[in-house]
Amino acid sequence: MPRKRKSRGTRDVAEILRKWREYNEQTEADSCIDGGGSKPIRKAPPKRSRKGCMKGKGGPENGICDYTGVRQRTWGKWVAEIREPGRGAKLWLGTFSSSYEAALAYDEASKAIYGQSARLNLPLLPLCQARLLHFLMNLKFVHVRIQMQDLVLVRSD
């Protein structure tokens, strides 16, 4: 009789990420109180694989995707997953319609797990969005809404 694989629900993954986020916030707060004297023991985020994607596996764009933790299914959907430090267990982050969305999900999980030392797929994204938002607000745009790759502007008259 084949063994049934144990799966985690989305609540379990969200709970694990919440605990890592709290741990990182606490260790960063403690290091501020100590004056940075004692550093917490923390596993470094993984480096990028030199192998890259497996040739001939996944969808048509899988081989050219450079995002960490992101791969394409044979039917074209993109998935994101990250490994939990210490345990090595994969945390399923979800299925997405684009590699960009999957990379954003990976980045959020990486920030939750590794804190400030996280290696991100899109490290300049928050900085670029903040500068763009500041620039647009100075142009007297009343309403600015940024959603993934779309920007909606409504000019005041």
Swiss-Prot record:
Record carries keyword Transcription regulation: yes
Record keywords: Activator, DNA-binding, Nucleus, Transcription, Transcription regulation
UniProt GO cellular component terms: nucleus
InterPro entries: AP2/ERF_dom (IPR001471), AP2/ERF_dom_sf (IPR036955), DNA-bd_dom_sf (IPR016177)
Biological-process GO terms, alphabetical: heat acclimation
Region (Disordered): 29-57
Motif Nuclear localization signal per UniProt: ranges: 5-21
Compartments it resides in: Nucleus
CDD domains linked to this entry: AP2 (cd00018)
Domain of life: Eukaryota
Family the UniProt entry places it in: Belongs to the AP2/ERF transcription factor family. ERF subfamily.
Task performed by this protein: Putative transcriptional activator that binds specifically to the DNA sequence 5'-[AG]CCGAC-3'.
UniProt xrefs under PANTHER family: DEHYDRATION-RESPONSIVE ELEMENT-BINDING PROTEIN 2A-RELATED, DEHYDRATION-RESPONSIVE ELEMENT-BINDING PROTEIN 2C
The protein's name in its UniProt record: Putative dehydration-responsive element-binding protein 2H
Organism: Arabidopsis thaliana
